Amino acid sequence: MLYLLTIFSLLLPALAINARSNSNVAVYWGQNSGGSQQRLSYYCDSDAVDIVILSFMHQFPSPIQLNFANACEGTYTANGILQCQTIAEDIKYCQNKGKTILLSLGGAAGSYGFSDDATAKQFAHTLWDLFGNSKNLATNDRPFYDAVLDGFDFDIENNWSTGYPALATELRTLFQKDTSKNYYLGAAPQCPYPDASVGPLLKQSEIDFVFIQFYNNYCNLGSSSFNWDTWLNYAETDSPNKNIKLFVGVPASSRAAGSGYNDPSAVSQYLTSDILNSKYFGGISMWDVSAGWSNTNSNGNFVENMKAIVKKASPGEETTSSSTTTTTTTTSTTISSSSSSSKTSKTSTTSTTSSSISSTTSSTTSSTSSSSTSSSTSSTTSSSTTSSQISTTSTAPTSSTSLSSSTISTSASTSDTTSVTSSETTPVVTPSSLSSAITIPGDSTTTGISKSSSTKPATSTTSALSSSTTTVATIPDDKEIINTPTDTETTSKPPAIITESDATTITQNLTPSTTTKNVKTTSTNIVTEWVWAPTTLRTLTTTYQILTTRTHIETVFAEPSTVVIYN
């Protein structure tokens, strides 16, 4: 019966995928994570599926090994490569129904990679001969016989990026040999940006589809660190392909990933209109289709639910959302008693971004006068600019200040309407030094995939640069409510050489104004902390925090410039 349907489908004109649409659904097929995987053609009969990604070629460049769990007959070519007659038939069947079929290279478990660009470039010709419209090999020497794929997906997860830009560039050259159809290249980075494995590929090569894994990581869809805006910024500013499409990758069921599963109603809530209506939004991708097919509700299976969500997208009504990164600027001034000269240190930091986030950037400036200083002045200016069509309001945070001979502390707190979990690292300040630290919240997990794997990759995080003292603020994970905690820092008793009246005078002179600005769901929390160092020196620390809903984790602010004037 399937044979007759295949013949009949060849007689019908097929509508090819609209690669520029933002309502496509891409599904991974081949690893049977749902436990009841059907043959490829079964899923292609559904209007909910637009792109099917065969997974995986898990070993390359030599030898080459393919694995499709329960979906291949187990015969081999003369070169020892798995050969699949049923998949070959289904590829052509699906293509004649307007589906795009890609082969994914890599996966969470496998042995693959290149030692240099020359090897990768040569491997592009191997891929073309095996799966493209090439006549260099006999049909019986090709894994899918005479079936011609529509392109390849790079699901590289071993943190080895060498060669992939060269491979993609050479494949583009080979694609031009066949003008009868369109060929595509995809990549499946994990959500931390830039991805350790395909970061260079994404910045150096023309990639059509980016299937971002917003699961198994701290930047999962629905988390306070969901970093769509980081990827949007990549598409707008860094991608060589200005028509690139970003897919929000989700697990198709709770069993399909270690973390990050959201039911259809939650996915619909988290994919806000600014995401759906972005011209760079391509749709939703899923790991994997077998898991999604068995995950049902009253509206159908999970794949059908995802298709219903992306159909709501209207790129012609694209909106702009604004946000800012979490910026921590620390200025420290240390003083010891002596006589008669003064020293002024001034630091200024300005940053501009247009993304929504909850990452942290820290910069620290220290200046010390230990010889002839009777007074010291330090001022810090930090400003963040966002572009938005949303009206703004201003409220003043509540603050409390306490001063004694042993400790001086100031704390401020604000509240807004967003849920954020943020991690902040404050470096220990040492005299006459300039340093900066960046901390990205991490969650490292590893899940292997073998012949019948049930989970797709987990993993990569970005480690923090130097830090000594860490303060972590955790806020409930509800996107509609934010309760910014009050930050208070108390340290050891100041030395006797500095009197309480001196400290009070300097406190009044150096305390910056405290304000809160609400831009959409952005809350700015400015905290002033007085730190007494356990030496004959006193240290003043001022911290500025900006907390937002979506994380732009790549934003890194430059070192603040320091001007020292001696009188």
UniProtKB/Swiss-Prot annotation:
GO biological process annotation, one example: polysaccharide catabolic process
Q: Where is this region: Disordered?
A: 313-471
Give me the Gene Ontology terms describing cellular component.
Answer: cell surface; extracellular region
Q: What induces it?
A: Expression is positively regulated by ACE2. Transcription is greater during growth of the yeast form as compared to the mycelial form, and down-regulated by micafungin treatment.
Domain GH18, residue spans: 23-313
- Gene3D superfamilies, alphabetically? Glycosidases (3.20.20.80)
Q: Where in the cell is it found?
A: Secreted
Q: Does the keyword Hydrolase apply?
A: yes
- From what superkingdom does this record's organism come? Eukaryota
Q: Which of this chain's residues carry glycans?
A: 159
* Gene disruption phenotype: Leads to strong decrease of secreted chitinase activity, as well as to the clumping or clusterings of cells from early exponential phase.
Disulphide bonds annotated for this chain are none
**Catalytic activity field:** Random endo-hydrolysis of N-acetyl-beta-D-glucosaminide (1->4)-beta-linkages in chitin and chitodextrins
Which portions of the chain have biased composition (kind: Low complexity)? 319-436, 444-471
What EC number(s) is this enzyme filed under?
3.2.1.14
Q: What is its main location?
A: secreted
One MF term in the entry's GO annotations: endochitinase activity
What task does this protein carry out?
Answer: Chitinase involved in the remodeling of chitin in the fungal cell wall. Plays a role in cell separation.
Question: Of which family is this protein a member?
Answer: Belongs to the glycosyl hydrolase 18 family. Chitinase class III subfamily.
Q: What is this protein called?
A: Chitinase 3
Q: Which organism is it from?
A: Candida albicans (strain SC5314 / ATCC MYA-2876)
